[in-house]
Amino acid sequence: MDSFSQFIEDCKFLHFDPTMEQLDQLLDFFELMTDYNKKVNLTTITDFEEVCKLHFLDSLIPFVLPEDIFPFPRLSCEKMIDVGTGAGFPGIPLKIFFPDIRLTLMDSLQKRLTFLDEVILSLSLNRKGEIQTLHGRAEELSAPAKKLRQDVPIYRESFDFVVSRAVANLSTLSEYCIPFVKINGFFLSYKAGHVEDEVQQAVKAISLLGGEIIQVYPYTLPNSEIQRSIILIQKKRSTPSEYPRKPGLPSKKPLS
């Protein structure tokens, strides 16, 4: 597929080869996204090659890098939640390439999730493994059971992997995400640029929430000068029951 030539080249540079079915699904996803983007603001990136690099490839990189470069567990049928998924990144590309994962796409805006429900149906992403959308705020959905209404399922400490490309600072993002992670599970934060200062400012908060930074991996997207970073955090202890705090507080007053 000529339209995917650069994407395929970038994939080969990272030592993995997408199948024709995966490429077809990515193309269908792109077409659905750009069409829906005309009525609901999903992304400012709509050029096909840019979407391939900045959304598709970037979503996949942590999970396809050789383990001697980035020691992240390989995916099989683990339970994963994508917090603040937006237009479905990184969750949808990960589900396309790792179809057996049991994926929850969480966002606070129902309009985005309506789009993602359409994507799931159109791409038949529920053929293998589970996939669902979840509407709400992270501060409420990951609260301890005693703070939940009886009709709300318990999501706290129930996921093997939590991923997020949300733009919040790492301290705030950790308060959103770490409560969802099982003990010994992982939180993976995708970040733009260099993050040394941001990481240092978040170390105490991450520890307070029960996490430990395993690795910070800076990289440049293939055939570009675009700098990104991956922050890998492992859950070592249960998150104290007072976290996350009430909705809005993690962003207004980040833990330090």
What are these regions (language model features)?
Residues 112-114, 195, 199:
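Short alpha-helix immediately C-terminal to the canonical SAM-binding loop
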Residues 181-183:
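Helix-to-beta-strand junctions that scaffold the AdoMet/dcAdoMet cofactor pocket
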Residues 200-256:
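SAM/dcSAM-binding transferase cores
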Residues 2-75, 81, 111-131:
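Class I SAM-dependent transferase core
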